[in-house]
């Protein structure tokens, strides 16, 4: 998701937290600015459109963006007894946010519990704590 937030540029990852680190592009121009902007707008709709799959994490006070996903784990194409895992990536979508956040979560065995929607609901609790505690 960071490629979308950085106008199509892949930031060089750091293994050690550096409070005053300056972002260094690892793969400049991996996406065009136009493509990154389109994807970002789509991820905003996931959380902010009432029909979006991540709408349960919507907040009126902070603009968030995200992507949901569900993977079926099964032995064959015709297998109906497999399980599912759900995942959700959500991040603050404004540069002016005082306490930005990026959460990427995955939960196994969400079949019958709402798929990725189950993960969205769990992350909404984390977001509430994050934004209300400061």
Residue ranges and their predicted role:
Residues 1-25, 50-134:
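Active-site beta-strand/loop architecture of penicillin-binding DD-peptidases
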Residues 24-50, 131:
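C-terminal beta-signal and terminal closure region of outer-membrane beta-barrel proteins
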């Amino acid at each position: 998701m960071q490629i979308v937030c950085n106008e199509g540029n892949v930031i060089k990852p750091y293994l050690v937290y550096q409070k005053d680190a300056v972002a260094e592009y690892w793969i400049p121009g991996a996406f065009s600015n136009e493509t990154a902007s389109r994807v970002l707008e789509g991820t905003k709709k996931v959380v902010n459109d009432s029909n979006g799959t991540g709408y349960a994490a919507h907040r009126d006070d902070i603009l968030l963006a995200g992507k949901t996903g569900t993977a079926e784990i099964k032995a064959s194409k015709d297998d109906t007894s497999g399980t599912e895992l759900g995942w959700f990536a959500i991040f603050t979508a404004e540069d002016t946010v005082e306490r930005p956040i990026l959460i990427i979560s995955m939960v196994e065995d969400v079949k019958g519990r709402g798929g990725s929607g189950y993960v969205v609901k769990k992350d909404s609790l984390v977001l509430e704590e994050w934004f209300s505690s400061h």
